[in-house]
Amino acid sequence: MLPQALEDAVKVAWVLCYSALLLVALAAAPQQRALQTPKEHTTRTRVVLLGTGTPVPDPERSGPATAIVVDNSAYLVDFGPGVMRRAKAAVLDRHIAALEPGNLKVAFATHLHSDHTAGYSDLIFTGWTAGRRTPLEVYGPTGLHSMTEHLLQAYRIDIETRTNPEGDQRSNPDGWKVNSHEIKSGVIYRDANVIVTAFPTKHAMESYGYRFDTPDRSVVISGDTSPTEETINACHGCDVLIHEARAVEMFAKLPEDRRSFGAKNHTTSEQLAALATKAKPGLLIVYHAWISWWPSVEAAGDQPVVLTSGGLHSTPDVLQREIGSRYSGNFVIGRDLDVY
């Protein structure tokens, strides 16, 4: 048995050793100013990331779709592939009843690229068959009327079958209808919960970002865009800014034609850090980023499986590092079904 003094010295040595190892581990860990797991939500207004992905299919990330939920009402921004399945997942996994498919009645499109709108028919018809009894109200840029009319025409047989008063598969007569509203900048929507203001963004077609002012929060979402003063002005100290980004490391590896397109129509991590420094949001959420939690290339027998289509994905830690080295504010790299 060790003398008491020696035993005490050994205990002290173990404590000092453990503390030193802990400090080394903390120093080696990536510096993250943001919460990687959203805290329990206590405000009336919640931001729900239904889809944070890109045009490239990724089993972890649905197409772009974000819900602003105020009390028991939900407002959808964009409706990429998988939107209604993700909405139901938010009901089951996050207990947000406002996102029941039949409850989705108001939506906003930032622009009409297919990766942001491929879930439009799903929003219309799944919401209808799930119980929506009033026309869907959808706001967006020029071309929304035409897209809506063509979708309804494409599903005419389904509509006629489900609304036939003598048929066996009857649904309510109004839930399939859509009131589409083509917008310009300014206040475009208001109700008892929210005022929605559209502002122009810079992308390959007519595009808008949106600011939501609710009783307790202000939320701005960019959609696809290169950095703009309009986005900075729309936020101007907002509670939450949701903005797209691409890692500089990945961007530099793209072919020249894609770099040229990206420079005009998207935002790099460095640019986003500079924009957020000026806009001063309480929380910056990075979404629609060309990243993947899956390896870029995996072996499948003798054939490689590539997640991208003629391009590259970065990893979340690269984007985290690039933004964190230039931005001192609170930020997160968003994942599907995160709630803030």
Give the ranges of each region predicted by the language model.
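Residue-level micro-sites within transmembrane alpha helices that shape
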Residues: V10-A13, D115, H243
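Bacterial N-terminal signal peptides
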Residues: L16-A25
